[in-house]
A protein has these predicted regions:
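ABC-type nucleotide-binding domain
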Residues: 1-240
Length: 240
């Protein structure tokens, strides 16, 4: 599968080929401009592949009605988007039919329940437009919770835990892995430490997939991944 943006002289992605099984956690890592966001944008059809195809459950994504695809795939971007209202009203954008129990379950998984419970009004605590009255980490956790409220088949986290400390990031990944059912999670991250326990890690470099495997395998077989990991380890960023 390849992707060339309209008007671009060269492809942003070339010869990408992988299979993600239901229930797996897939890590995506690479340097700036390597194609990470381009890759995950093909799953919900923000863009369409110019060569090859992306399939969900054996069916090309182009064959899904967009409304059905949006119900199957939830994307959480690095820049959290919150609306003026309350915590509850923001979460209900994930599903208008969600009960309070559903909201709290999503908050627990997203590691947001504790700070919401500490608010005087809990779920009814006011949220300013853009979440101006919340910290970066709180906003990211609420947007992850909102995505979970919709009960998607595929959850894409595009560097959306970047404002979380390592302990909270690790707790989030553990909670996602423990969810019942067959949720497939794509984690795009600059932190190799965030992907160490993924079932598969896709390593991108200049729009090409230069590595695919588990953490230990890639340390042995993929120079690009090894370089990323070791550079972060030396800085104290790559932790178990």
């Amino acid at each position: 599968m390849s992707l060339t943006y309209k008007g671009a002289g060269a492809p942003s992605l070339s010869d990408i080929n992988f299979t993600a099984k239901r229930g797996q956690t897939i890590g995506v890592i690479g340097g700036t401009g390597s194609g990470k966001s381009s890759l995950i944008s093909l799953i919900p059809r923000f863009y369409d592949a110019t060569e090859g195809s992306v399939e969900i459950m054996g069916r090309p994504v182009r064959q899904y009605p967009r409304v059905d695809l949006r119900g199957k795939v939830a994307v959480v971007m690095q820049k959290a988007q919150l609306f003026g209202g309350t915590i509850r009203s923001n979460l209900l954008w994930g599903s208008q039919n969600a009960s309070d129990a559903d909201l709290w379950a999503a908050l627990e998984t997203a590691q947001a329940a504790e700070f919401v419970k500490a608010k005087p009004l809990g779920l009814d605590e006011p949220v300013e437009q853009g979440g101006r009255n919340l910290s970066g980490g709180q906003k990211q956790r609420l947007t992850i919770a909102r995505a979970l409220v919709g009960k998607p088949d595929i959850l894409i986290l595009d560097d959306s835990a970047s404002a979380l400390d390592y302990a909270t990031d690790a707790a989030l990944r553990k909670a996602l892995a423990a969810l019942p059912g067959d949720l497939t999670v794509f984690i795009v991250s600059q932190r190799a430490a965030s992907l160490q326990h993924a079932d598969q890690i896709i390593v991108l470099d200049d729009g090409r997939m230069v590595g695919l495997g588990r953490h230990a395998e890639l340390l042995e077989s993929c120079p690009v991944y090894k370089e990323i990991y070791e550079s972060q380890f030396k800085k104290g960023d790559a932790q178990k």
